Design a protein with these regions (language model features):
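Core catalytic architecture of nucleotide-activated donor-dependent transferases building glycoconjugates
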Residues: 107, 111-116, 127-129, 142-157
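Glycine-rich phosphate/ribose-binding loops and adjacent secondary-structure elements
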Residues: 134-187
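Non-catalytic, usually N-terminal nucleic-acid engagement modules in DNA/RNA processing proteins
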Residues: 1-124, 128
Length: 187
């Protein structure tokens, strides 16, 4: 990994009320769309004027239910709803590639990658009110991630801010994660 790569880390929280104490201390937070979807009003949490990130809640929906309960249009509306706060980016509704997710859908890894790109395109077409829609790369091996990056084509430019999915639940050798990042950082 090169020293000039800008890695951004966000503290994932499962309840909006946990955000404010963290933002007061200078931490950036990542809040799931699953917990914000039914909130009333346009204020996701106290302290939302600080930069924060919206996670699509994909793992809960896909791994536990085998599909997305929230349409791409509804998710784009959620992004637009909070665009006037400190929301700086939202992840696409990606189909992760952990074995549990593949079993839940009954689909192949390559199909999950194609569905992730299709949902990215649909959310972007629905509009995000200027909030960056983060493309997410999915796979299991370095070649999988590289192929997914290539599948996005011109949608992802050089030096783009992207998410790298299906890493957080891995156990074992951290060198595997380094190999994945090396494979996609070539471009």
């Amino acid at each position: 990994l090169t020293a000039d790569v800008d890695f951004r880390f966000y503290v994932g929280i499962h309840h909006p009320r946990m955000a404010w104490p963290l933002t007061l201390r200078g931490f950036r937070v990542c809040v799931s769309a699953n917990v914000l979807r039914d909130r009333l009003g346009d204020v996701p949490f106290l302290g939302c004027d600080a930069p924060w990130f919206l996670d699509s809640g994909a793992f809960t929906q896909v791994a536990l239910k085998g599909r997305f309960e929230q349409s791409t249009d509804d998710y784009a509306a959620t992004i637009r709803r909070f665009a006037g706060t400190g929301l700086i980016a939202a992840s696409t509704q990606d189909y992760m590639c952990e074995p549990v997710a593949l079993r839940a859908t009954g689909l192949t890894l390559r199909r999950h990658q194609a569905l992730t790109i299709a949902r990215f395109d649909a959310i972007r077409a629905a509009g995000t009110a200027g909030v960056h829609l983060l493309p997410v790369l999915q796979g299991r091996t370095p070649d999988d991630y590289r192929r997914h990056l290539e599948g996005y084509g011109a949608r992802i430019g050089y030096g783009a801010w992207v998410g790298v999915g299906s890493l957080c639940k891995r156990q074992g050798d951290p060198g595997v994660i380094a190999a994945i990042l090396d494979a996609i950082l070539l471009d």
